[in-house]
Amino acid sequence: MTNIRKTHPLAKIINDSFVDLPAPSNISAWWNFGSLLGICLILQILTGLFLAMHYTSDTATAFSSVTHICRDVNYGWVIRYMHANGASMFFICLFLHVGRGLYYGSYMFPETWNIGIVLLFAVMATAFMGYVLPWGQMSFWGATVITNLLSAIPYVGTSLVEWIWGGFSVDKATLTRFFAFHFILPFIISALAAVHLLFLHETGSNNPSGIPSDSDKIPFHPYYTIKDALGALLLILALMTLVLFSPDLLGDPDNYIPANPLNTPPHIKPEWYFLFAYAILRSIPNKLGGVLALALSILVLAIIPLLHTSKQRGMMFRPLSQCLFWLLTADLLTLTWIGGQPVEHPFIIIGQLASILYFTILLILMPAVSIVENNLLKW
């Protein structure tokens, strides 16, 4: 009798994706983040579902309902903080996953890479709208500032902003629709993730050496299932340490003050995972220019495959490109730091220099250094 796992229409899909999938024999722990992101997504959907059972998306009661979840619901505080800090873990995994793709040339699978960029935008949109829901000071003013950026679009900007708000300011209609979008987007993300995997499995995984691994494949199970299980264990350990020891470490204290349209917080800033983009936005004095730079800070990833000039796929054997990659990493950390600082000297000029460096590395230096490395190969 043939094994049901290989014949049953549903079991066959799971089998071909997670059991009998041929995988390169040399992929490192940097290839764990796909499964970790899947775990993060499932965790966020589950905790979010339980939060939605108690949350009310009304300006009068939203803040109180979150307080009620934390104080009165059985283990509500655990669910709430797992959801809030789960978003941070999600973004840590996302940034590491994208960084791995850049380092090892995984962007040479264009469909997989481009769907990944769409996924990144979708997760960022979801996180932004989720941050608005508790209706604290930073929720309200963050929503006001970020949605207002769309007014920089010529001709249709103002109408577009009022259309998104559902009125002339961020109010009840805005909160209700943000809750609706925040609820539906994770399911769209799940569907996109399935397509992301579909395209990945068309080509098979890349590997650290960047050379084809067809001659040396091993089954996904048990080798990589056990490896992913270890990664999952470490992820849950990190998340629960954060949740149980310092749940507010990555949050903003201003969000414990109920939203007040008449009182602006001294420093409006988003969650830490948006600070690098926020720093790029603020480094340009012109509003439309800032918005374009903000969009390009992520969209620049889409043209990375077109700028690949190296004869080698990954950076494993390219020390000059490696130096640039780690300079880019340091630059992003600098931007993240600047995004959380007030707009004053010397932070303004540091932010502007870091923003210029970010685009210079990706668009000019990396392709140029790759050409130099190609010529060095001839020696």
Curated annotation (Swiss-Prot):
<keyword id="KW-0479">Metal-binding</keyword>
<keyword id="KW-0349">Heme</keyword>
<feature type="transmembrane region" description="Helical">
    <location>
        <begin position="178"/>
        <end position="198"/>
    </location>
</feature>
<dbReference type="Pfam" id="PF00033">
    <property type="entry name" value="Cytochrome_B"/>
</dbReference>
<dbReference type="InterPro" id="IPR005797">
    <property type="entry name" value="Cyt_b/b6_N"/>
</dbReference>
<keyword id="KW-0408">Iron</keyword>
<feature type="transmembrane region" description="Helical">
    <location>
        <begin position="77"/>
        <end position="98"/>
    </location>
</feature>
<dbReference type="InterPro" id="IPR036150">
    <property type="entry name" value="Cyt_b/b6_C_sf"/>
</dbReference>
<feature type="transmembrane region" description="Helical">
    <location>
        <begin position="347"/>
        <end position="367"/>
    </location>
</feature>
<feature type="transmembrane region" description="Helical">
    <location>
        <begin position="320"/>
        <end position="340"/>
    </location>
</feature>
<keyword id="KW-0496">Mitochondrion</keyword>
<feature type="transmembrane region" description="Helical">
    <location>
        <begin position="288"/>
        <end position="308"/>
    </location>
</feature>
<dbReference type="Pfam" id="PF00032">
    <property type="entry name" value="Cytochrom_B_C"/>
</dbReference>
<keyword id="KW-1133">Transmembrane helix</keyword>
<dbReference type="InterPro" id="IPR016174">
    <property type="entry name" value="Di-haem_cyt_TM"/>
</dbReference>
<feature type="binding site" description="axial binding residue">
    <location>
        <position position="182"/>
    </location>
    <ligand>
        <name>heme b b562</name>
    </ligand>
</feature>
<dbReference type="GO" id="GO:0005743">
    <property type="term" value="C:mitochondrial inner membrane"/>
</dbReference>
<feature type="transmembrane region" description="Helical">
    <location>
        <begin position="226"/>
        <end position="246"/>
    </location>
</feature>
<protein>
    <recommendedName>
        <fullName>Cytochrome b</fullName>
    </recommendedName>
</protein>
<dbReference type="GO" id="GO:0045275">
    <property type="term" value="C:respiratory chain complex III"/>
</dbReference>
<comment type="similarity">
    <text>Belongs to the cytochrome b family.</text>
</comment>
<feature type="binding site">
    <location>
        <position position="201"/>
    </location>
    <ligand>
        <name>a ubiquinone</name>
    </ligand>
</feature>
<keyword id="KW-0813">Transport</keyword>
<dbReference type="GO" id="GO:0008121">
    <property type="term" value="F:ubiquinol-cytochrome-c reductase activity"/>
</dbReference>
<feature type="binding site" description="axial binding residue">
    <location>
        <position position="97"/>
    </location>
    <ligand>
        <name>heme b b566</name>
    </ligand>
</feature>
<keyword id="KW-0249">Electron transport</keyword>
<comment type="function">
    <text>Component of the ubiquinol-cytochrome c reductase complex (complex III or cytochrome b-c1 complex) that is part of the mitochondrial respiratory chain. The b-c1 complex mediates electron transfer from ubiquinol to cytochrome c. Contributes to the generation of a proton gradient across the mitochondrial membrane that is then used for ATP synthesis.</text>
</comment>
<keyword id="KW-0999">Mitochondrion inner membrane</keyword>
<dbReference type="InterPro" id="IPR048259">
    <property type="entry name" value="Cytochrome_b_N_euk/bac"/>
</dbReference>
<keyword id="KW-0679">Respiratory chain</keyword>
<dbReference type="InterPro" id="IPR005798">
    <property type="entry name" value="Cyt_b/b6_C"/>
</dbReference>
<keyword id="KW-0472">Membrane</keyword>
<feature type="binding site" description="axial binding residue">
    <location>
        <position position="196"/>
    </location>
    <ligand>
        <name>heme b b566</name>
    </ligand>
</feature>
<feature type="binding site" description="axial binding residue">
    <location>
        <position position="83"/>
    </location>
    <ligand>
        <name>heme b b562</name>
    </ligand>
</feature>
<dbReference type="InterPro" id="IPR048260">
    <property type="entry name" value="Cytochrome_b_C_euk/bac"/>
</dbReference>
<feature type="transmembrane region" description="Helical">
    <location>
        <begin position="33"/>
        <end position="53"/>
    </location>
</feature>
<keyword id="KW-0812">Transmembrane</keyword>
<dbReference type="GO" id="GO:0046872">
    <property type="term" value="F:metal ion binding"/>
</dbReference>
<feature type="transmembrane region" description="Helical">
    <location>
        <begin position="113"/>
        <end position="133"/>
    </location>
</feature>
<dbReference type="GO" id="GO:0006122">
    <property type="term" value="P:mitochondrial electron transport, ubiquinol to cytochrome c"/>
</dbReference>
<dbReference type="InterPro" id="IPR030689">
    <property type="entry name" value="Cytochrome_b"/>
</dbReference>
<keyword id="KW-0830">Ubiquinone</keyword>
